[in-house]
């Protein structure tokens, strides 16, 4: 019995350290964005990085109307923008598509000034058949 206790005491810090990664797994992930330009008559798939994962959160049992409640979500901390230019577009067509590329991520309150804070669709979208 004493040996089990010693092993548990030795392993407990290691388990707690490995568990911290499980509690907050907000990190960069590779994604593909399908973009269609009807004006240019083309459809492309762009590979980029985004933020995805779980953030530690808790919900109060009692909800007070005086206290605002929010959940932390996995958001871009730093990002840049890249552009793609559609080829073979008619004159005056909008041939430039600009998209964000995540450089780092963080668990934070969603900032609706720069982010769509709604629920993401799990459905993969493709180009429309014309």
UniProtKB/Swiss-Prot annotation:
Keywords: Disulfide bond, Glycoprotein, Hormone, Secreted, Signal. GO terms for molecular function: hormone activity. It comes from Carassius auratus. Glycans are attached at residue 30. Involved in gametogenesis and steroidogenesis. It comes from the Eukaryota. Residues 1-18 form the signal peptide. The lineage of its organism: Eukaryota, Metazoa, Chordata, Craniata, Vertebrata. The keyword Signal applies. It is found in: Secreted. Its main location: secreted. Belongs to the glycoprotein hormones subunit beta family. This is Gonadotropin subunit beta-1. Disulfide bonds join 26-74, 40-89, 51-105, 55-107, 110-117. GO terms for cellular component: cytoplasm; extracellular space. Pfam families: Cys_knot.
């Amino acid at each position: 019995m004493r040996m089990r206790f010693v092993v548990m005491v030795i392993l407990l810090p290691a388990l707690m350290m490995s568990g911290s990664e499980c509690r907050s797994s907000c990190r960069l992930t590779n994604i593909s964005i399908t973009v269609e330009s009807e004006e240019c008559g083309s459809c492309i798939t762009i590979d980029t990085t985004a933020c995805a994962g779980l953030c530690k959160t808790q919900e109060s049992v009692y909800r007070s109307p005086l206290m605002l409640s929010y959940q932390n979500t996995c958001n871009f901390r730093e990002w840049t923008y890249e552009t793609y230019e559609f080829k073979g577009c008619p004159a005056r067509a909008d041939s430039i598509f600009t998209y964000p590329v995540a450089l780092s991520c963080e668990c934070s309150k969603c900032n609706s000034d720069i982010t769509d804070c709604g629920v993401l669709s799990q459905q993969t979208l493709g180009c429309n058949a014309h």
